[in-house]
Amino acid sequence: MSAAESVDQLIERFNLAQGELVKGNAEPANELFSHREDVTLANPLGPTAHRWDEVAAAGEHAASQLRDGEMVGFEAIEKYITPELAYVLRVERAKAKVGEGEDIAPMALRVTMNFRPEEGTWKVVHRHADPITTPQPVESVIQE
């Protein structure tokens, strides 16, 4: 199987795993991450997780804040694949009950993921997700 086919297969598996995450189950997504020391996760709920134990815990925490959800769509922006490294930039859209809320709420995340082959299987080595999907004023970066 070519690198492009393998990465596309991993992305499809990750899409399905995200469907589980918005139902409160982090395990399928966590299985797709590298377990090596250089793996990272930067999600909207906290500081960057670095190393497998922190990444797994951050994924579990994110899943614990979501329930009764479903993925609505994935909007590909760019994808680049080499035999040794690949990345995808996209917008992920979902709806779920968030935190203590009882209403299903729409969510959108701008996501970058990096992948690499490890022992014959492609893995996620970095994921960054944030809720910025529309233009923002420069003042939005100010923290008081």
Regions found by a protein language model. Give the residues of each.
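A short, polar/proline- and glycine-enriched secondary-structure boundary/capping micro-motif
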Residues: 98-102, 134-140
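A detector for short, charged/polar N-terminal pre-domain segments
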Residues: 2-6, 137
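Generic short beta-strand segments
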Residues: 90-97
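Amphipathic alpha-helical repeat scaffolds
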Residues: 11, 15-19
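A short, structured loop/turn motif at beta-sheet edges
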Residues: 79-87, 102, 115-123
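A solvent-exposed, acidic/Ser-Thr-rich amphipathic alpha-helical stretch
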Residues: 7, 20, 26-82, 91, ...
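Short beta-strand edge/turn micro-motifs at domain boundaries
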Residues: 108-138
